[in-house]
Amino acid sequence: MNSFVLMATVIREPELRFTKENQTPVCEFLVEFPGMRDDSPKESLKVVGWGNLANTIKETYHPGDRLIIEGRLGMNMIERQEGFKEKRAELTASRISLVDSGNGINPGELSSPPEPEAVDLSNTDDIPF
C-alpha cells in the first residue's frame, strides 16, 4: 500500500487545468518542507489534486499556507532539455488539511466552539451518590 502524509508549506500558487478528454479538473502546486537534519536545505515537491479536490485546492490554498497532505507518492520520468531523463517525485493528494494560513489566520480562529457554561460546585452535599 502506498500511503504518504506530509506537512509542508505552499510555495507556488495552485494552477488549475482540465483534461482534454472529459474535462476533469486537475490542480498542481509546489510545496516545501524541511530536510532531515537541521543543517539540510529545504526540499520541494509537486502536489497534484484531481476532481473536486482540484477545485478546492485552487479556491482555498495559497503560498504561505501550511498544510497536512495525505495521498500517494509516485515517480515520473521527465525528459530534460539537456537531453537526459530525470526522475521526479510527485504526491497525488487524496485529502488536505490546513494547519495555518499564510495570512496569519489559524484555522481554529475562524470558528471556535462556544465556551461551556460555568457550573456551581460549591454545594456538593446534595448530590445523592
Swiss-Prot record:
Can the keyword Thylakoid be found in this entry's annotation?
A: yes
Q: Name one GO cellular component term.
A: nucleoid
Keyword Zinc-finger recorded: no
Q: What is its main location?
A: membrane
Please give the superkingdom of this protein's source: Bacteria
The record's section on CDD domains has: SSB_OBF
Compartments in which it is found: Cellular thylakoid membrane
> Quaternary arrangement and interactors, per the entry?
Homotetramer.
Q: What is this protein called?
A: Thylakoid-associated single-stranded DNA-binding protein slr1034
